[in-house]
């Protein structure tokens, strides 16, 4: 594969997501990364790609049917909780911004699992604030087109792997940097870990910003 164009076919009345995939991203992911699938839905994805085969370059087109599973998370058991994710209510959209995507970082409701521990020190940090993350990308129709499945990196039973996720930045390479509790991390939108590190011991907890340096 030399390059690719991807189009996620929108639901009826929905918002199209279409993008180009560079050669470097094809090599990084070992194939075509697909972004913007509707959760718990049978998506149609159109892929147009250039490939070199036996010395010849040709353009090919494929249409894939891809079911994406439902949004996942840790339910709190609170009586007011009606779903694992909040709903977006779109009031008005300007036509020139109709193709925009919005990154939203929100907080879930704590439950018994997330409230087991606290630093045994009156000068402790943010461990008390054990809100599970609700981090999504929504389109201008209010549909969730990406969500952070935090279950593999945010562990309520581990005091060094939980805490409020904050300070999200999208870097020039497209990857996200952020911090939570005793950690700071960098992942791409496909869920590939670049790094996930403990804070130095001199820090109490992560709060609230993480600014990537020029290098």
What would you call each of these model-derived segments?
Residues 15-27, 152:
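Solvent-exposed serine/threonine-rich low-complexity stretches and specific carbohydrate-binding patches
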């Amino acid at each position: 594969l030399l390059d690719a164009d991807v189009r996620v076919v929108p639901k009826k009345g929905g918002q199209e997501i279409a993008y180009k995939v560079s050669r470097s991203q094809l090599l990084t992911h070992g194939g075509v990364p697909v972004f913007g699938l509707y959760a718990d839905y049978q998506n149609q994805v159109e892929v147009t790609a250039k490939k070199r085969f036996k010395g010849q370059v040709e353009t090919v087109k494929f249409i894939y049917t891809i079911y994406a599973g439902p949004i996942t998370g840790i339910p709190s058991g609170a009586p007011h909780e009606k779903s694992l994710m909040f709903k977006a209510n779109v009031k008005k959209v300007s036509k020139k911004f109709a193709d925009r995507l919005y990154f939203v970082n929100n907080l879930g409701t704590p439950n018994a699992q997330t409230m087991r521990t606290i630093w045994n020190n009156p000068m402790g940090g943010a461990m008390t604030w054990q809100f599970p993350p609700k981090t999504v990308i929504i389109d201008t129709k209010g549909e969730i087109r990406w969500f952070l499945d935090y279950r593999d990196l945010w562990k309520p039973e581990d005091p060094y792997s939980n805490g409020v996720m904050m300070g999200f930045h999208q870097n020039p390479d497209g990857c996200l940097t952020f911090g939570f509790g005793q950690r700071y991390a960098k992942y791409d939108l496909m869920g590939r870990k670049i790094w996930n590190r403990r804070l130095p011991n001199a820090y109490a907890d992560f709060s609230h910003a993480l600014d990537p340096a020029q290098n």
